[in-house]
Curated annotation (Swiss-Prot):
Record keywords: Cytoplasm, Cytoskeleton, Endosome, Golgi apparatus, Membrane, Signal, Transmembrane, Transmembrane helix
UniProt entry tagged with the keyword Transmembrane: yes
Name of the gene this protein is made from: Tm9sf2
Organism, scientific name: Rattus norvegicus (Rat)
Its job: In the intracellular compartments, may function as a channel or small molecule transporter.
Membership in a protein family: Belongs to the nonaspanin (TM9SF) (TC 9.A.2) family.
One GO CC annotation: microtubule organizing center
Name of protein: Transmembrane 9 superfamily member 2
Main subcellular location of this protein, as a coarse class: membrane
GO biological process: ceramide metabolic process; glycosphingolipid biosynthetic process; protein localization to membrane; regulation of heparan sulfate proteoglycan biosynthetic process
Cytoplasmic face of the membrane: 322-374, 420-437, 488-522, 576-591, 653-663
Localisation per UniProt entry: Endosome membrane; Golgi outpost; Cytoplasm, Cytoskeleton, Microtubule organizing center
Keyword Cell inner membrane appears in the UniProt entry: no
Amino acid sequence: MSSRPPASLPARGPRLLLLSLLLLGTVPGPRPGSAFYLPGLAPVNFCTEEKKSNECKAEIELFVNRLDSVESVLPYEYTAFDFCQASEGKRPSENLGQVLFGERIEPSPYKFTFNKEETCKLVCTKTYHTEKAEDKQKLDFLKKSMLLNYQHHWIVDNMPVTWCYEVEDNQKFCNPGFPIGCYITDKGHAKDACVISSEFHERDTFYIFNHVDIKIQYHVVETGSMGARLVAAKLEPKSFRHTHIDKPDCSGPAMDISNKASGEIKIAYTYSISFEEEKNIRWASRWDYILESMPHTHIQWFSIMNSLVIVLFLSGMVAMIMLRTLHKDIARYNQMDSTEDAQEEFGWKLVHGDIFRPPRKGMLLSVFLGSGTQILIMTFVTLFFACLGFLSPANRGALMTCAVVLWVLLGTPAGYVAARFYKSFGGEKWKTNVLLTSFLCPGIVFADFFIMNLILWGEGSSAAIPFGTLVAILALWFCISVPLTFIGAYFGFKKNAIEHPVRTNQIPRQIPEQSFYTKPLPGIIMGGILPFGCIFIQLFFILNSIWSHQMYYMFGFLFLVFIILVITCSEATILLCYFHLCAEDYHWQWRSFLTSGFTAVYFLVYAIHYFFSKLQITGTASTILYFGYTMIMVLIFFLFTGTIGFFACFWFVTKIYSVVKVD
C-alpha cells in the first residue's frame, strides 16, 4: 500500500508559535536550524542495551502532545481519545507558555530500545460494542475527529516525529503531525489523507491509521562521550485490518469502519521501528530537514523588499520636508522682525500658541500610551531574544513565557509614561490614572481571554487554561505588574511636567474650515495603509502558524519587519501631522495616535478575509474563539502602533517648534 500523498494533500504542521535566528548571521538561509542550540540545550546520548550507562541511555521515550485540526480551533488531549494509554511514566513539566498554547505532553505506551528493531509489534487492542452507549460515544468521537482531520503530534528526544511526503513541484514536505484517519464521503469523495491509497474506496466509511512505520536516524558521536545522538524521527501512517489480532502480521486490507457499522468492532494498534545511521546530519542541525521543507522563503524576501521600498519612499518624503520645506520655513520665520511680517505668518507657525494645548480625554490617551509603551518594549526584547536563538521551536513555550514575564516586569515604564504625559496634559487625578493604567487594557484582554477560556472549558478542550494557571496569571498581574506600575507612576508624577518649547495661549485659536483630505477621518484612514503594507505578507505566515498549525521560525525576517514597521508608522504619522499643522489644525495628539493605530483596523479586516478565504474552520465555538482571540491581537496591535505614532509626532512637533523664534 502506497503511503506517499499526492500534491493535493495540504501541507500542515503543528502550531509552534515561536515567533530563532540571528538577525545578521542567521537570517534564514541554506541551514535555518543551525542557530537553534546556541543557548545550550544539551544533547542526549543513546547506546545499545549492553552499553548503557548514566551518560548513555538505551531506552527511547516517545511522548504524545495534544491533537489539533485546521478545521477546528479546539485541540484535545491525547487521553481524551480512546487510544492506547501509557500504564506508567512521568508527565513532563510544562512552562507557562506551553499551558497558554494548549500543549499537553504526556508519556505514551510506545517504548523503544536504541538500535533494536521491531516489526508489527502490538501495542493494544480496542474493542467497541455499538449497542453500548459508552462504546458508541467513544467511537463517535473518534469518527468526528477523523472527519475534522485531527492530527497526532508525537515527540522523540524533543524532536517532532514527522511524516514526510511530496507536495507540489516534487518538493518534500515534512509534517510534524499525522492524521488519526480519514473519511470517504457517501458520494465516494476521498477527504484529506484518504487520497494516499486506492484501497480507501468504500463510500461513507472511515479508515483509521492504526499502524505506524517509524524510522529513527542517528549520528554516531566521533569524539568525547560514546554513543549516538538522534537526528531525525520519521513515520508513515498505515491502516491494517489485522487477521490475527493477538499475533498481527501487518498485512491484509485497510482497517475500515463503516459509518453505519454495528456489532463488535476491534482495532489493533501496532508499530514497526527501524534505525538508520546518518553521517551527514549533525545533532546541532537536526531541525534543518523540517525547516527546509517549509515553503515561501522567497516570499519572505519579497516581503522585506516590498517593505523597504515603502520605507525609502516615506523616508524621502520626510527628508524633503525636514531638509527643504521646514528648513526654508524656519529660516523665513526667524528673519521676520517686524510686526507687519509677523502678521503675514502662515502655515504651521500660526498655531504655535495652541500646539501643546492639552488634548480632550487626556486621561485615556495617557493610559493608552503607558500600555502601548509596555507592549512596544516587550515586543522588541522578545524578538531580540528570539533572534539570538533562545526562543526556538526546540525550546517549547519559550516565546509566550518570555512575552508574559516581560509584560509583567515592564509595569514600571508603563506607569511612568502614563503619569508623565498625564501630568503634562494638566491632569490632577493621579490615582485614577495609575489605576486605569494598571487595569484598563490588561483587564479588557483578560476578560476576553476568560470568556474564551469558558468556551474551551465547556467544549472539554485541552486549550482551556487550568484554574491554577489562571490564579497564577492573576497573581503575576496583581502582585507584580500592578505594584511596578504604581512605582513607575510615582516617579512619573514626582518629576516636573514636560517643558514645551513654546507657551500655550489662554484662548484657543479657531481652526479654519478644513478640506476633505485634512479632515481627521480621511487622514487617519490613509495613515494606516502604508504600515499595513509593510506587514501583511508576514502577517499571513503568523496567522498560518496560529490557526493552520504551521511552524514559524523566521525571526530574523520578523525582527526586520518589526523595525520597518516602527519606521513606517513614525514617518507616515509625521507626514500627515505636518500637513495638518500647515492647515492650521493643532489637534495632533489623538490624531497621531489614531493615524498609526488605524493599522490595527486593517489587521482586523485582513483577519476576517483570512478566516473566510484561507481557513476551513467549522462550528460556532471555533468561530467565536477565532474572532475572540483576534480581537485581543487587534487591541494589542492598536496600542503598539498608536504609541509609535504618538511618540514620533511628539518628537517632530517638539523639534520644529524649538527652533523657531516666537515672541
